[in-house]
Regions:
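C-terminal helical "tail/cap" subdomain of flavin- and related membrane-associated enzymes
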Residues: 210-297
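Conserved FAD-binding catalytic core of PHBH/FMO-like flavoproteins
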Residues: 56-164
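Short, solvent-exposed loop/helix junctions and linker helices
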Residues: 3-8, 135, 202, 257
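A general structural signal for well-ordered alpha-helical segments in protein cores
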Residues: 7-11, 15, 82, 86, ...
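Solvent-exposed, non-membrane alpha-helical residues enriched in polar/charged side chains
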Residues: 15-19, 100, 142, 146, ...
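Conserved N-terminal helical subregion
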Residues: 1-70, 78-83
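Structural motif
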Residues: 38, 105, 115, 176-177
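FAD/FMN-dependent oxidoreductases across multiple families
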Residues: 129-225
Length: 297
């Protein structure tokens, strides 16, 4: 279905690529404080006072995107009464490269394999519980996690920092403005139950690159609304479909109604017995269905 890749490895690979490309001028620890549309370009002011001019500005500044706010791009959606508790563990048993997900009344608990005998835990709890658990010392936190996790990985200990963040669903009403394109969490934020937030962001990048390349070959203005509209039409419906599908799954699997639980179990067993349907769902979850941009072939 896919591979788990640690964030640090992705960052290192990207950094290696951009530092070897002389056509990329990169700036760290810089923030856009202002952007203004001009005739034929967009002017960007950084927090150090430096000004840059570009044909196209790409907003990848997260779900609280200041670029989107300044462009008056509103979002639709809602906050869940859930937060994700995230940590890494080192364990006795081998995970064999297999990811696990447990569905509990408070929300899913995912065990995602990392290198060696290590796994990443993404553990969903109601907001009040998550806030309390996050304040516990490591011994008590580990004890609560062990009660939910069971012993299939043997004894374990938490390594590194623990994090928590509130969960929400949001879709930007527009993914574009003149000379501005939103990607990733700046455009859409989904429940982590399907583990597709990062993949959706990568697909945004691949589609935008595809559109820009085609426009360049045609001699078109890369930041024009006509060009950027193609990106929005390709990605917005797909992103909304993913967001609402994950919302439905969260409601379905975080509900302990007996009739619903029985129907859910029957449905999963039926799906497991139909290989074609199972393969199609795996492809859908991996984001490799429908029209794919060149970078994803």
């Amino acid at each position: 279905m896919g591979q788990m890749v640690e964030d640090r490895f992705i960052r290192k690979a990207l950094f290696t690529k951009i530092t070897k490309n002389e056509q990329i001028d990169y700036k760290f620890n810089s923030k856009v404080t202002e952007h203004k549309k001009q005739s034929g370009y967009i002017s960007v002011t950084l927090d150090n006072g430096k000004k840059l001019n570009t044909k196209l500005l790409v907003g990848a500044d997260g779900r609280n995107s200041e670029l989107a706010n300044r462009a008056e791009i509103k979002k639709s959606g809602w906050k869940y009464n859930q937060s994700a508790l995230v940590c890494a563990i080192e364990h006795e048993a081998d995970h064999n490269g297999v990811a696990w997900q447990y569905f509990m009344p408070s929300g899913p608990l995912a065990v995602l394999p990392m290198t060696g005998k290590r796994s990443c835990i993404v553990w969903t709890e109601q907001n009040a519980n998550a806030k309390a658990i996050n304040l516990f010392d490591e011994t008590r936190y580990t004890k609560i996690l062990a009660a939910r996790l069971g012993n299939f990985l043997g004894k374990f200990k938490i390594i590194g920092d623990r994090h928590t963040y509130p969960l929400e669903l949001s879709i930007a009403d527009r993914f574009i403005d003149e000379r501005l394109a939103l990607i990733g969490d700046a455009a859409h934020s989904v429940h982590p139950i399907a583990g597709q937030g990062l993949n959706a962001g990568f697909k945004d990048i691949a589609v935008l690159a595809h559109i820009i390349q085609d426009a360049h070959h045609r001699g078109e203005d890369l930041g024009s609304l006509g060009v950027l509209k193609r990106y929005e039409e390709w990605r917005r419906f797909d992103s909304a479909q993913l967001a609402y599908s994950t919302d439905l799954f969260n409601k379905l699997f975080s509900n302990e109604n007996e009739a619903l639980r029985l129907a859910r179990n029957i449905g999963l067993k039926l799906l497991d017995s139909i290989p074609v349907a199972k393969r199609n769902i795996i492809k859908e979850a991996a984001g490799i269905t429908g029209e794919l941009p060149r970078l994803m072939h």
